[in-house]
């Protein structure tokens, strides 16, 4: 028969008010105590699973089960102590004994055992400790310990547990299950920190042998959410694979300092690659990741990323440094005779990348984007992302923007580092803007509903000297003043609109170093008016398609543009160029980009758009547009520049269209969503002047579930493929390029990822990678291999960077340094969610 504490017992163990009850604890406490030195067998693991509250569930696809929750109903007062037992023997001057279904509760701490001994201070008669023996179960919120012996100290709420099987629920970012393990001793401190002696630690299910940490000691800091294992071994399927004297790991979602999972890889240009990242959580709003890389063919590279977030600023600084690159030294030695430009280059390789956005005031913002590399070959040697490997212009820009109700003011400095790898198509440098000053105003409350846009811009253009293109070193440079006020009067009705507009463009140039024209200075002033009339109608009707009701719109649009001709071939080209023709170009007021060329025009654009909108939600299911420009005169303004004032553009120049044909290409665009998972977009432009396709693209995206993705794309650009020929000249050919990428689950835990990009024009691949990924309950693994186009060799055949990487993620023990070693997954598989990504 269970009994409550009698009155005589009350005087013995009273501690700041004792509450007691005669309720009987009927739940049995299982005997799950096995000495720490006993090896785990399958039978023992099965027994441990029951002890820890593991519930097998085959409907749980990843973990195949779950833990029963740990619930403790707290007492009314955190200092209240309640003790129950079947029998009790009390002594005023000795320890007291409680036997049979013993349960003690203090606040949210509950301890069950078969036997308990109560000790008191002989002077104060206050309870100093309670010792529990035989089938001990120790519970706290998110904590369970089953042990041979436990000692609790009611006064400071600390305790010790011996020969322990434990389960600690922790809120980690990537672990699906609580941590569990064994220890010869666990100390629970008054601040709720824990010290585990001769302990194991894993977040795998009890019967899963995937991985475990076996350590001399493990300290868990509850406040910092951090665990530290000392003299630790990492066991994979019970085999020791790694020893470390110190291992730090998180116990909650907060960022923690410590080593991250290593990066292991191999490439044909760098050899074997081992990266050992260390994450330093400097402050809640500052952190740094240091990544030393060992390349067997190159040497030791030290890299890092520093991130910061303040009330006004956010930014990232990335840097890498590799002294005395062995492979690069051999490259210079082998090629410096044939290519003297590379003679004297340093073998110290480095890069810096700085991005910052600072909001000084609500209307004053600074943006910085700076990138620099040590030499022309750095990106080829150390990047596996096609967009980076083939990049030849690195931006360096800072701008300060101030906004008011009607005006925006901006000051900017901009330059580029131009890369010139040997035996490749020469790349022309880009003009520096040092500085650019811009003011843009907008007023929409004028009489007659008129709107006024004003743009004023000053650019100081500077041409960087380039040892690779000496012939271009005497290019023109100097200031350019640009003014462009626009007055328009939009007249809007529910059924349509008409917007007449008038504007003028004024450019002033003060040119120095006028290259080979025999003059050192020249001034040009240009004032050109523009007139336009834009109008459109809106029609709609109900549409019923496959059981769904839609609203179909029909939107015809006309746009007339008149710009008189002014000869501009004497004026240098700082930032103007041809643009790829598509639907968007139908309604532009200038067929050139930038401000240096103001295209003459006497033309009418006509287009038709139809949309399908879901009747209930308004979501757009389809959008189809088609249009063309009718020219009433030839286009006389040329992009080229000449000291004689007369020149003709090369018809094979990328983006150039016929200047004499009576109509523009026919531009069309389609967007269609078959369902929420499947959509297709495409542009097709047909040129009647050449009776051929001018450019086209088609993109397909299919994503029925997260990380079940198929993307396909094709693009065609006439004259878009610049090819180097044997005599070091270049020729323009049509560019055909296709890309296919996918991420698809192969089973509940296995998935495949891959992408392939092929240059149909040149008959070789640009980029390809293929990987397989395993994502289980407590660990994940990914192996990813591929190659990226690097350059052409002496025989004008493609050369590639070949890479393979292995990543292993032990969930609950830390994250990897980056979402993937090469940074290509999110680039080439839009919509992909990376389980390896550090949040």
From Swiss-Prot:
It holds the Pfam family LptD. Component of the lipopolysaccharide transport and assembly complex. Interacts with LptE and LptA. Coiled coil: none annotated. The keyword Signal applies. Residues 1-21 form the signal peptide. Together with LptE, is involved in the assembly of lipopolysaccharide (LPS) at the surface of the outer membrane. The gene is lptD. One of its GO terms (biological process) is Gram-negative-bacterium-type cell outer membrane assembly. Belongs to the LptD family. It is found in: Cell outer membrane. PANTHER family: LPS-ASSEMBLY PROTEIN (PTHR30189), LPS-ASSEMBLY PROTEIN LPTD (PTHR30189:SF1). This is LPS-assembly protein LptD. One of its GO terms (cellular component) is cell outer membrane. InterPro entries: LipoPS_assembly_LptD (IPR020889), LptD (IPR050218), LptD_C (IPR007543), OstA-like_N (IPR005653). Keywords: Cell outer membrane, Membrane, Signal.
């Amino acid at each position: 028969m269970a009994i409550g504490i009698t009155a005589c017992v009350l005087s013995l163990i009273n501690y700041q008010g004792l509450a007691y009850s005669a309720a009987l604890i009927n739940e049995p406490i299982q005997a799950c105590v096995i000495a720490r030195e006993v090896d785990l067998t399958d039978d023992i693991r099965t027994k441990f699973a029951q002890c820890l509250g593991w519930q097998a569930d085959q409907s749980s696809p990843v973990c195949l089960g779950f833990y029963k929750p740990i619930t403790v109903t707290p007492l009314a007062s955190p200092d209240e102590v309640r003790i129950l037992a079947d029998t009790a023997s009390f002594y005023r001057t000795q320890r007291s004994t409680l036997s049979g279904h013993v349960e003690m509760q203090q606040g949210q701490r509950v301890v069950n055992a078969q036997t308990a001994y109560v000790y008191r201070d002989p002077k104060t008669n206050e309870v100093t400790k309670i010792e529990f023996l035989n089938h001990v179960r120790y519970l706290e919120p998110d904590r369970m310990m089953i042990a041979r012996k436990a000692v609790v100290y009611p006064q400071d709420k600390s305790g010790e547990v011996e020969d322990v099987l434990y389960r600690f629920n922790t809120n980690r970012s990537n672990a699906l299950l609580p941590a569990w393990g064994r220890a010869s001793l666990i100390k629970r401190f008054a601040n709720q920190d824990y010290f585990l002696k001769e302990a194991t630690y894993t977040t795998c299910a009890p019967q899963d042998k995937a991985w475990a940490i076996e350590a001399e000691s493990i300290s868990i800091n509850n406040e910092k959410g951090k665990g530290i294992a000392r003299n630790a071994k990492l066991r994979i399927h019970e085999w020791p694979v790694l020893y470390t004297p110190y291992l730090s790991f998180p116990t909650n979602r907060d960022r923690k300092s410590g080593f991250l999972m290593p990066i292991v890889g191999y490439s044909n240009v760098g050899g074997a690659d081992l990266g050992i990242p260390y994450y330093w959580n400097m402050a809640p709003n500052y952190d740094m990741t240091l990544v030393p890389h060992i390349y067997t063919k190159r040497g030791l590279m030290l890299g890092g990323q520093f991130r910061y977030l303040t009330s006004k600023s956010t930014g990232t600084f990335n840097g890498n440094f590799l002294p005395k690159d062995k492979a690069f030294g051999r490259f210079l030695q082998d090629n410096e005779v044939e290519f003297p430009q590379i003679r004297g280059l340093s073998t110290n390789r480095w890069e810096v990348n700085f991005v910052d956005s600072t909001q000084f005031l609500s209307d004053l913002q600074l943006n910085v984007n700076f990138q620099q590399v040590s030499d022309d070959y750095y990106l080829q040697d150390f990047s596996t992302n096609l967009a980076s490997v083939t990049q030849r212009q690195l931006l360096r820009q800072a701008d300060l923007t101030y906004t008011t109700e009607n005006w925006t003011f901006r000051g900017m400095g901009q330059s580029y580092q131009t890369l010139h790898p040997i035996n490749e198509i020469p790349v022309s440098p880009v003009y520096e803007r040092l500085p650019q000053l811009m003011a843009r105003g907008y007023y929409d409350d004028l009489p007659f509903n008129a709107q006024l846009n004003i743009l004023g811009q000053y650019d100081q253009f500077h041409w960087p000297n380039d040892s690779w293109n000496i012939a271009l070193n005497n290019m023109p440079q100097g200031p350019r003043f640009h003014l462009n006020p626009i007055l328009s009067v939009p007249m809007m009705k529910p059924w349509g609109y008409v917007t007449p507009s008038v504007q003028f463009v004024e450019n002033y140039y003060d040119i120095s170093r006028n290259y080979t024209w025999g003059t050192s200075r020249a001034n040009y002033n240009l004032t050109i008016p523009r007139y336009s009339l834009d109008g459109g109608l809106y029609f709609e009707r109900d549409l019923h398609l496959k059981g769904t009701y839609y609203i179909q719109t029909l939107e015809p649009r006309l746009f007339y543009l008149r710009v008189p001709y002014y000869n501009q071939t004497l004026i240098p080209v700082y930032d103007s160029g041809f643009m790829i023709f598509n639907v968007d170009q139908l309604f532009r007021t200038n067929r050139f980009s930038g401000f240096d060329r103001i295209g003459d025009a006497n033309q009418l654009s006509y287009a038709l758009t139809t949309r399908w909108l879901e009747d209930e939600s308004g979501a757009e299911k389809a959008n189809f547009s088609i249009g063309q420009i009718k020219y009433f005169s030839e286009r006389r303004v040329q992009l080229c520049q000449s000291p004689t004032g007369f020149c003709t553009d090369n018809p094979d120049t990328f983006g150039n269209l016929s200047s004499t044909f009576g109509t523009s290409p026919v531009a069309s665009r389609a967007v269609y969503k078959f369902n929420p998972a499947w959509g297709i977009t495409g542009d097709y432009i047909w040129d009647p002047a050449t009776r051929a396709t001018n450019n086209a693209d088609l993109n397909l995206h299919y994503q029925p579930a997260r990380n079940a993705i198929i993307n396909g794309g094709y693009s065609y650009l006439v004259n878009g493929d610049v090819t180097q020929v044997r005599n070091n000249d270049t020729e323009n050919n049509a560019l055909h390029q296709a890309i296919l990428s996918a991420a698809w689950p192969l089973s509940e835990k296995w998935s495949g990822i891959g992408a392939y990009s092929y240059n149909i024009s040149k008959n070789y691949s640009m980029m390809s990678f293929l990987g397989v990924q395993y994502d289980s309950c407590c660990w994940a693994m990914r192996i990813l291999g591929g190659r990226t186009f690097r350059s052409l060799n002496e025989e004008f055949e493609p050369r590639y960077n070949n890479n393979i990487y292995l990543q292993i993620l032990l969930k609950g023990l830390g994250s990897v340094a980056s979402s993937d070693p090469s940074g290509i997954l999110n680039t080439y598989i839009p919509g992909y969610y990376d389980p390896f990504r550090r949040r």
